[in-house]
Amino acid sequence: MTYNKRLFTSESVTEGHPDKIADQVSDAILDEILKDDPNARVACETTVTTGMALISGEISTTTYVDIPKVVRETIKDIGYTRAKYGYDSQTMAVLTAIDEQSPDIAQGVDKALEYRNDISEEEIEATGAGDQGLMFGYATDETDTYMPLPIFLSHQLAKRLADVRKDEILDYLRPDGKVQVTVEYGEDDKPRRIDTIVVSTQHAEDVELAQIEKDIKTHVIYPTVDKALLDDETKFYINPTGRFVIGGPQGDAGLTGRKIIVDTYGGYARHGGGCFSGKDPTKVDRSAAYAARYVAKNIVAAGLAKQCEVQLAYAIGVAEPVSISINTFDTGKVSEARLVEAVRKHFDLRPAGIIKMLDLKQPIYRQTAAYGHFGRTDVLLPWEKLDKVNVLKDAVEIQ
């Protein structure tokens, strides 16, 4: 029997990928600052390359952080602890070039008094966005995590790849790695099977490719992927170049913010272009993208749509979003206009309102910097809450 089908592919990378090292370092520095100064302004950029890391950006804070120490501890946690891995947390150089936040930006954000948990309505209204921009959030009912299956499985496989290395199940693996999953969708637009899985993993020099292929299937793919999604036609490409010994920052330079599609929905939904890592929550690139996911997930969980994409947009120095747009891809039970009306009423999408609503001044960001910011099953994140489901149902009068 033949049927119309489509294929969709997403990718993820391990915590040892150069760009993800940079993201984790930037967010580790952010967390360390927020522990003592939740009102800090942080825009921290990291560059990693052979033998060194460069930390740059703008930071305004009342606390002191030993940045080289944070950098070294983060890279050690990832697993780059020996020179033979091409990157050693203890012997690498750490350079810093940090400035304060521009006063021109600060005057647009800081109209309110210093942030407090009991921030008043007047203070919320007086706190403008830190930049202009547009942000997207998305949710779908095709998985229990309300994430598209290709990116969900890519993250699960990438995380498992790191776990078997750290637990020494496969002690010849090294920290760098990438995963790609192609899912076949049927006429009902639901996942039917996995068409292709690609795994590229850094490894010790003395391991044969046949051994790597066997071990990755046995210890990474089969324990992670539902066997019902695999069949005789599923294709596996494991280290398809045949060799992946040189990796990490020795193989490629890494930069904060270069894995924005990995961080979000794997290309399944649109992206506003701004990255997350290294940014404190006054930056709407981060906080509004989290809020948009929060809105979209609650709409889908409420049964008001099978898919939902939310766009928010802001002007620098202005508190209210300049636009809220919702697209349910013809799966909505009510009009998109009614959903927008309900969202405006029940979600505070002003920058300070988002921070208060999602409690974003906490040092929670390092854990988001690898394996995705959304749909996580291993950590609890405030924008993944489903506490607005009944509120939304009541707002649009759906029982």
Curated annotation (Swiss-Prot):
Subcellular location: Cytoplasm
Family, similarity comment: Belongs to the AdoMet synthase family.
Nucleotide-binding is among the record's keywords: yes
The name this protein goes by in its record: S-adenosylmethionine synthase
EC annotation from Swiss-Prot or TrEMBL: 2.5.1.6
The reaction(s) this protein catalyses: L-methionine + ATP + H2O = S-adenosyl-L-methionine + phosphate + diphosphate
Bridged cysteine pairs (disulfide): none
Entry binding sites for Mg(2+): D19
Pathway annotation from the record: Amino-acid biosynthesis; S-adenosyl-L-methionine biosynthesis; S-adenosyl-L-methionine from L-methionine: step 1/1
